[in-house]
Every structure is written in structure tokens, then in C-alpha cells.
A protein has these predicted regions:
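Active-site beta-alpha turn of Rossmann-fold NAD(P)-dependent dehydrogenases/reductases
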Residues: 12
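Ribokinase/PfkB-type carbohydrate-kinase core domain
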Residues: 1-9, 70-71, 90-228, 261, ...
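Conserved post-catalytic alpha-helical subdomain immediately downstream of the catalytic base
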Residues: 6, 17, 38, 207-210, ...
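Residues at secondary-structure transition points
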Residues: 23-27, 53, 193, 239, ...
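Substrate-binding N-lobe of the ribokinase-like
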Residues: 8, 17-84, 88-93, 98-104
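Short, basic and Ser/Thr-rich N-terminal targeting/leader segments
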Residues: 79-82, 216, 271
Length: 293
């Protein structure tokens, strides 16, 4: 796009985490969109919501509170806005029930969005659970020549290793966590090696030359053009672990879209932002000046 800020087209699972006492807007790629918008990249969202109360609330928050571009979020009459019902047991341990079907199972990529020529396209494996989305994303990727960013989430019951590897081959930049690296590394023929060996095996199988792995308390690692970089940790008091990896992913995308790319610096910046997010309540904390720069 011809504008100062690079733009990013994101396919988002717009959903609500429904707790017994509250409802929180979420979805991994939606969280990425929020953080990109707060950084130096314009977020253009692709999704669907239902014609219901939660759909109206989601659009209002994304558009009016976050300031993101929602023109390509459709409102459907035949499917509800996505939800995840969170139930807490006697010990406070959560269990989750993902609503199916949901409006975000029907994400279209209209010609108007493609014509905007966004510098990056972000998609995640969770949204690939529906055939509609798989067809829509595949059709778009056939002719898209920008940066393709794929978030590999192996979340039961949508945790097909074969499908994740298939879609990883369409990406330029792949993000996952340490557990997912173990699983995908094993599928790539490196089950017992160190992270470097698993990254190289996965790159060899998928053809992706930029892979980032978040590892909770351990430093993140990144493969970039054949070299492996190790991050550092930023000790914080964890208030809410949800969304830290999404902020990390957003920061890495932002760095890739603002050349020249410094892999070590980008890894440090992304780790610092993810650490800051988990020290706050919620996956989309306000950027109030306390965030790392």
C-alpha cells in the first residue's frame, strides 16, 4: 500500500471467552491485530461475527476502542459470534468448550482487500478448522506475494500435525511455542534433538526460513536465514499468561516490516513486549507508556 505505515491483513477468530462472571474478547490472531495496531503497522481485519449482542460488542470494541479497520468483518445471520465457555472447577482450574459452529468459520477475503496489497498476511491454524476458511485462504495465497505469517497452534481437537505442516509450507514466517516445536520437530524427523536441530529439521521439511519459538520461562529462539538466535528473559510477575505469545508474534511481524531487519534486536524487542503483556491483566492491555519501546 502507498502509505507511511505498512499494512497487515489478518484473518481473525473473533470470539469471546465466557467466564462465569465476565466475557472477554479474544482470539489469537485478533490479539495479534491489536498489538500490531499499537506498534507501527496498520491492522486490517478479516473475520465474521453473528448478528447478535456479542457481535455488536466485538465490532464496537475493535473499531471504536482499538481503532482498527473493521470494514472486512462480516455480520452473518446464519451463525453466532464465536465463544469459548470457560468453566472453573473447585480448585480454580479452567476447562474450555469452543463453540461450534461460529461465525469466524466463514472468513472471506474479498477482492477489495486483496487489491490493497498489504505488506503482510497473517493466518493461524485454529481458523483452518473449517473447509470454508481453508478454501478462502488457499485461493488468496495462490497470488499473494507479500510476507506470509503463520501461527501454528496445536490445540485439541484441532491439532492435526499433518495439516499444520501442509500450511506451514505456504508461509514465510512461522511462529509456535516450545511444545509445538517438540511435536513438529518430531514429525520432521528430529524428536530428541536440541531446539536448534528441531528448527533446522522443520525448516528443511517446510521450506520456511524464519521460525520463532516462544518457550515460557526459557529464552525464545529464532531461525533466520539458516542462523539460530537465542533471546533473553525479562523477569516479571506473571499476572495473566494469556496473550504474551500473540504480542511476541506481533512485534516480530512489525520488525520484519520495518527494514533493515536485525534478528537479535527484533527477538529482544518481541520478548520484552510479551513479558510486559503477561505482567498485565488481559491479552490486550492499554499501551499507557509503561510498555517497552
Amino acid at each position: 500500500m502507498t502509505q507511511d505505515k505498512p499494512s497487515c491483513l489478518l484473518t481473525c477468530e473473533v470470539l469471546w471467552d465466557c467466564f462465569p462472571d465476565r466475557e472477554l474478547l479474544g482470539g489469537a490472531t485478533l490479539n495479534v491485530a491489536y498489538h500490531l495496531h499499537q506498534l507501527e503497522t496498520r491492522s486490517i481485519l478479516l473475520s465474521s461475527v453473528g448478528r447478535d449482542r456479542l457481535g455488536e460488542l466485538a465490532l464496537r470494541q475493535i473499531r471504536d476502542e482499538w481503532g482498527c479497520d473493521t470494514r472486512f468483518i462480516r455480520t452473518l445471520d446464519d451463525a453466532p459470534t464465536g465463544t469459548v465457555t470457560v468453566t472453573l472447577d473447585d480448585r480454580g482450574e479452567p476447562s474450555y468448550e469452543v463453540g461450534t459452529p461460529a461465525a469466524w468459520d466463514q472468513i472471506d477475503i474479498p477482492a477489495e482487500a486483496a487489491a490493497m496489497r498489504p505488506e503482510a498476511f497473517v493466518f493461524g491454524s485454529v481458523a483452518l478448522r473449517s473447509g470454508h476458511n481453508r478454501r478462502s485462504f488457499a485461493d488468496f495465497l495462490e497470488s499473494y506475494d507479500g510476507l506470509r505469517c503463520f501461527d501454528a497452534n496445536l490445540r485439541p481437537p484441532h491439532n492435526s500435525v499433518e495439516m499444520v505442516l501442509e500450511w506451514a509450507r505456504r508461509a514465510d514466517f512461522l511462529k509456535m511455542n516450545g511444545e509445538e516445536l517438540d511435536v513438529l520437530g518430531r514429525a520432521a524427523g528430529c524428536g530428541d534433538g536440541d531446539p536448534e536441530s528441531k528448527l533446522n529439521a522443520l525448516a528443511g521439511m517446510s521450506g520456511v526460513n524464519t521460525i520463532c519459538v516462544t518457550r515460557a520461562e526459557e529464552p525464545a529462539v529464532m531461525l533466520w536465514q539458516g542462523a539460530v538466535f537465542h533471546g533473553e528473559t525479562f523477569p516479571v510477575e506473571v499476572v495473566d499468561a494469556v496473550g504474551g505469545g500473540d504480542a511476541f508474534f506481533a512485534s516480530m511481524i512489525d520488525s520484519l516490516l520495518h527494514p533493515p531487519f536485525d534478528p537479535a534486536g527484533a527477538l529482544r524487542r518481541a520478548t520484552a513486549l510479551g513479558s510486559w503483556v503477561v505482567s498485565r491483566r488481559g491479552a490486550q492491555p492499554p499501551y499507557d507508556g509503561s510498555q517497552p519501546r
